[in-house]
Amino acid sequence: MSGYDRALSIFSPDGHIFQVEYALEAVKRGTCAVGVKGKNCVVLGCERRSTLKLQDTRITPSKVSKIDSHVVLSFSGLNADSRILIEKARVEAQSHRLTLEDPVTVEYLTRYVAGVQQRYTQSGGVRPFGVSTLIAGFDPRDDEPKLYQTEPSGIYSSWSAQTIGRNSKTVREFLEKNYDRKEPPATVEECVKLTVRSLLEVVQTGAKNIEITVVKPDSDIVALSSEEINQYVTQIEQEKQEQQEQDKKKKSNH
């Protein structure tokens, strides 16, 4: 058994490539990331690891990276692995602009990132990337939001709302209950609020460990400040309390 465990390009007798499956386990241990498509925006939200007391917070890397002026990428899994993927994706986006004089489409970039991940499952002397990504943005001259996911195996898929990383099952169940594909969040505020609510299902420490980036058409990408995120968290907690009080009243009336 151990031989199949170690060798990357060998299938086990029952058809598994264990190293790729272990890479997925690394993703499940990574901090949670969520992507939600609104009517005219895409929001990426991430759980940030707590910084230590003496750590310089300015160079704590963001979990959301800009690949081009209209595409952002968030990840879950090994930070160092993600840096390589992000760098490769940026270079590809730049060379596409230079060669074709046109920005990449979001799907093209997703396919490229998934292709890099796939190559690292089939080569000797390398290991798979321990990273899943969420890639969000708008195509040039198009107002339709796009959200894709890639996995260590090289699979990529398109989503209305998706989550990766630890506790992603809990967050996905929340999104399945609260996200309506026929009527996605109509405003940026609604979309951000749903993203923050989904993250609060698993992030215990509130606003200080949440990161939110909003992508709108025409290369309009904004990272929300801690104060803005805090306002959303406070509002959500107030609504929760009001709901609990209403439920209590209903019970006591019965």
UniProtKB/Swiss-Prot annotation:
GO cellular component terms, A-Z: mitochondrion; nuclear outer membrane-endoplasmic reticulum membrane network; nucleus; proteasome complex; proteasome core complex, alpha-subunit complex; proteasome storage granule
Family matches, as SMART domains: Proteasome_A_N
Location, primary (coarse class): cytoplasm
Alphabetic keyword roster: Cytoplasm, Nucleus, Phosphoprotein, Proteasome
Alphabetical list of PROSITE patterns matching this protein: PROTEASOME_ALPHA_1, PROTEASOME_ALPHA_2
Keyword Ribosomal protein: no
Domain of life: Eukaryota
Family membership: Belongs to the peptidase T1A family.
Protein name: Proteasome subunit alpha type-4
Source organism of the structure: Saccharomyces cerevisiae (strain ATCC 204508 / S288c)
